[in-house]
Amino acid sequence: MRKGTVKEVLAKIKYDPRENEEDYYIIIEHRGSYGNVRKIPVRIIELGHGYFFIGETQIPYHRILKVVRKDGKVVWESRKIRK
């Protein structure tokens, strides 16, 4: 697993030319969805200061549970899950 904040990990995925954002997705806590989680491709999100955006919808970073590569490798995981 990579070290750093979820925002740092996402910034590396989105802006480092060695990474391909198409290869990653995030799992967020999303009440009302099946299992209360939602899978979102990294390519459709925009990073903000305390939030990330999907279109005009802003979602706080603390709702991200995992960042996962499409081969299933978890590259970042929330402390909520690690407990």
From Swiss-Prot:
<dbReference type="InterPro" id="IPR040459">
    <property type="entry name" value="MJ1316"/>
</dbReference>
<dbReference type="InterPro" id="IPR007547">
    <property type="entry name" value="UPF0248"/>
</dbReference>
<dbReference type="Pfam" id="PF04457">
    <property type="entry name" value="MJ1316"/>
</dbReference>
<protein>
    <recommendedName>
        <fullName>UPF0248 protein PYRAB10580</fullName>
    </recommendedName>
</protein>
<comment type="similarity">
    <text>Belongs to the UPF0248 family.</text>
</comment>
